């Protein structure tokens, strides 16, 4: 191997650590044999990508270079397979890319499940130098993160369940207290008004969605909080619970605005604008507070970090991938 290739070593390793797949792609394109480079601890680039959770570099190696089959049997000085490495807790800088302990644990589980697909069946229970299987390593390394994730999930569910319970109380009371009173026949006085129809539909919609959201949040509080629950089950419940909370809040404010319009705006039409403005205020507050969390949950749960992403289409090695087959 030439001196020029060795000059790429530090750049390649640093690019893997930083998950800068463009640099890795450029180096591999110009010098394919650099794929065999190792750092001072003896880890090659796929091992480093797994240890440091560099998903873009991992995807580049896996889907473009077609190199991964030869990595299945690689072990480090402690007899750790690549699945053992995936079971280790990610470095703090990698964990901090994701907000919230529960989502961090979800990302760790996604990595473990991804590498599990890559290894051979017998490697799932293969033991390292310390007589530990990959599953045992994962559980041991993530005990603290699991506790933090449980606290984070419960705290989030509790705060949201309080809001949902308040909405249920308010809209239920509004449903049995008909604005304007009833006729002798028992029918509402305003039943012919469009605003009353909007109120009735919005209030009922708010009641149903807030009650559904409350049940979802309660199901989180009573969950077992096993490792697998953090992968899909708990995040999915929180996603749908937050969606129900957004919808119920919006519907409640629409119902409240419709009643104000019904009562005041026949003779004071100028009040319509301030009513709409103030009705939007609580909606904007809850959106500002909770939408970033909802977006993070949806991206983490439904948008996989592994696979052939669009950014790989422009990689130079994509047009040169056959040269790596014999390495």
State where each predicted segment sits:
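Transmembrane alpha-helices of multi-pass eukaryotic membrane proteins
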Residues: 10, 43-44, 154-164, 194-208, ...
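A broadly tuned "polar low-complexity/structure-edge" signature
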Residues: 81, 251-252, 258-260, 264-265
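Membrane-proximal extracellular juxtamembrane segment immediately upstream
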Residues: 46, 167-171, 175, 205, ...
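Acidic, Ser/Thr- and Pro/Gly-rich low-complexity regulatory segments
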Residues: 1-165, 176-188, 217-230, 264-269, ...
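C-terminal substrate/ligand-recognition segments
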Residues: 15-17, 21, 55, 198, ...
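Helical transmembrane-bundle signal
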Residues: 165-171, 210-217, 252-255, 259, ...
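Cys/His-rich Zn2+-coordinating "finger/knuckle" modules used by eukaryotic regulatory proteins
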Residues: 191
């Amino acid at each position: 191997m030439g001196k020029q290739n060795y000059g790429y070593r530090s750049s390649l390793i640093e690019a893997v650590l930083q998950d800068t797949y463009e640099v890795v792609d450029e180096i591999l394109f110009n010098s394919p044999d650099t794929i065999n480079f190792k750092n001072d601890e003896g880890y090659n680039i796929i091992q480093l990508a797994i240890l440091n959770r560099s998903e873009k570099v991992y995807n580049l190696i896996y889907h473009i270079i077609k190199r991964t089959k030869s990595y299945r049997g690689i072990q480090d000085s402690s007899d750790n397979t690549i699945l053992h490495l995936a079971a280790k807790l990610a470095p703090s800088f990698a964990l901090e890319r994701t907000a919230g302990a529960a989502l961090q644990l979800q990302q760790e589980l996604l990595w473990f499940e991804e590498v599990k697909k890559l290894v051979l069946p017998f490697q799932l229970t293969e033991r390292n130098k310390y007589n530990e299987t990959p599953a045992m390593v994962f559980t041991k390394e993530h005990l603290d993160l699991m506790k933090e994730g449980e606290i984070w999930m419960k705290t989030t569910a509790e705060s949201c369940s309080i809001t949902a319970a308040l909405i249920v109380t308010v809209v239920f009371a509004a449903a049995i207290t008909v604005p304007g009173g009833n006729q002798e026949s028992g029918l509402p006085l305003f039943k012919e008004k469009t605003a009353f129809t909007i109120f009735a539909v919005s209030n009922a919609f708010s009641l149903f969605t807030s009650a559904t959201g409350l049940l979802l949040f309660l199901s989180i509080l009573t969950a077992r909080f096993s490792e697998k629950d953090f992968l899909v089950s708990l995040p999915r419940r929180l996603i749908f619970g937050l969606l129900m909370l957004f919808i119920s809040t919006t519907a409640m404010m629409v119902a409240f605005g419709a009643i104000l319009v019904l009562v005041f705006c026949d003779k004071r039409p100028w009040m319509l604008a301030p009513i709409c403005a103030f009705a939007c205020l609580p909606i904007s507050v809850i959106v500002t507070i909770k939408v970033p969390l909802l977006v993070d949950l949806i991206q983490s749960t439904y948008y996989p970090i592994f696979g052939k992403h669009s950014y790989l289409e422009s990689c130079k090695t994509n047009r040169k991938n056959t040269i790596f087959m014999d390495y």
